Amino acid sequence: TFLQLDEETAQVQAAQTRASLPLAGLAVSIKDLFDIQGQVTAAGSTVLARAPSALADCPAVARLKAAGGVVLGRTNMVEFAFSGVGCNPHHGTPINPCDVAVARVPGGSSSGAAVSVATGAAFVGLGSDTGGSIRIPAALCGLVGFKPTARAVPTEGAFPLSTTLDTVCAMTRSVRDAITVHE
């Protein structure tokens, strides 16, 4: 599910978060499509593993942090966001937590984000949706996910699949949580 997990930094962030913020201290997972300052954004691929680290958080990550969200880590995804199944040939395919007895796909391309939320590891999973990359894994993992209006959240700092169709969005376990995150 997680390609990078930074529990120590998350604990420090949580301790420093103001309790009055809407996401105060809640764990946030970030799809490996979004820039996080100091980290490489590889879009689920090994080709970009040696790319330069991001100089700043993308606007979506910055907004979640400003709302008190604590970045737990960077999640697995379909390579270059180019499938709705959720498989990644380099990092493995996260198992759909709805039925762990049988290895079922979680849907994609935001597969790791969905699994992180469905297992309770994260309150919200930041992802993207071009042709179903939030809606498909949300449906397969029993979560809430929708494709918001284009540009409702800036796409700068996100690896593009389609610059005219990409949207930034998140998955949660309830509609109430989705409203809190998207406000």
Question: Where are the language model's segments positioned?
Answer:
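Fold-level recognition of mixed alpha/beta catalytic cores in primary-metabolism enzymes, strongest
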Residues: 87, 115-183
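Gly/Ser-rich catalytic/binding loops embedded in alpha/beta enzyme cores
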Residues: 1-130
